[in-house]
Amino acid sequence: MATFTDAEIDELFETSGTVIDNIITAQGKPAETVGRSAIPQGKTKVLSAAWEKHGSIQPPASQDNPDRQDRSDKQPSTPEQTTPHDSPPATSADQPPTQATDEAVDTQLRTGASNSLLLMLDKLSNKSSNAKKGPMVEPPRGESPTSDSTAGESTQSRKQSGKTAEPSQGRPWKPGHRREHSISWTMGGVTTISWCNPSWSPIKAEPKQYPCFCGSFPPTCRLCASDDVYYGGDFPKSK
């Protein structure tokens, strides 16, 4: 799955907004006219056909004025009386250039919008392909990253050094005693008991004195030299 950073997501949103704006404004504004009202885009052909139809249909001369018909019988007809009925108004002659201009502007706007949309789509596809390729880059087989090798070496060195200095970091470890204390509250008051145990013995809640089984621990130390009983005998008396 492709992953995007915050900057790439912001750029994608901005690019998408530009594409939407280009789609909305692809048709553009109609060409402005000087001296007359603007004709809506796409209505030029309809208006021209209406003018031609209106010019071709004219009422008979007899219905306009009976006196004019009588005068026309007596006088020869002139070209000025027939030409207005055969040709459309002067404004219709101006329509083809306006129609051509509107179509040219419309075509230019659509072509520009299409090119802009194609550029935006190419940019989006490039961003998506780069995002997919970025996180999947792996080192060639047979070569391990430098960080992994150094990490492995440092781990091995720590393990090896730990073996030699496991008991203590500053001085060699020697078997000895550990002083333990027990405090209890009774009706007679507070009772305190203290004794020594070998360093290997476990620490438990109940007071217990452990003897040495391996012979490596001394029977007494400077802390328990004055105790009454040692190792395996009765529990030391309270003092």
Curated annotation (Swiss-Prot):
Subcellular location(s) of the protein: Host cytoplasm; Host nucleus
Major site of localization recorded for this protein: host cell
GO cellular component, one term: host cell nucleus
Residues at which Zn(2+) 2 binds: C212, C214
Biased composition (Basic and acidic residues): 65-74
Keywords: Host cytoplasm, Host nucleus, Host-virus interaction, Inhibition of host innate immune response by virus, Inhibition of host MDA5 by virus, Inhibition of host RLR pathway by virus, Interferon antiviral system evasion, Metal-binding, Modulation of host cell apoptosis by virus, Viral immunoevasion, Zinc
UniProt KW Zinc keyword: yes
GO biological process: one example: symbiont-mediated suppression of host JAK-STAT cascade via inhibition of STAT1 activity
Pfam families cross-referenced by the UniProt entry: Soyouz_module, zf-Paramyx-P
Residues holding Zn(2+) 1: H177, C196, C221, C224
Region annotation (Disordered) ranges: 47-111, 127-184
Gene Ontology terms, MF aspect: metal ion binding
Ranges of Polar residues composition bias in the record: 75-101, 144-167
Record's miscellaneous remark: The protein V from strain B1 contains one putative zinc-binding domain on its C-terminal region whereas protein V from wild-type avulavirus strains possess two.
Quaternary structure (record): Interacts with host STAT1. Interacts with host TXNL1. Interacts (via C-terminus) with host CacyBP; this interaction inhibits host cell apoptosis.
Record function comment: Protects the virus against cell antiviral state by blocking host interferon signaling. Mechanistically, targets host phosphorylated STAT1 (phospho-STAT1) for degradation, thereby inhibiting the interferon alpha signaling pathway. Plays a role in the inhibition of host apoptosis. Interacts with and down-regulates the expression of host TXNL1. In turn, inhibits TXNL1-induced apoptosis through the BCL2-BAX-caspase 3 pathway. Inhibits host apoptosis also by negatively regulating host CacyBP/SIP. Promotes viral replication by activating the extracellular signal-regulated kinase (ERK) pathway.
Family statement: Belongs to the paramyxoviruses V protein family.
Protein name: Protein V
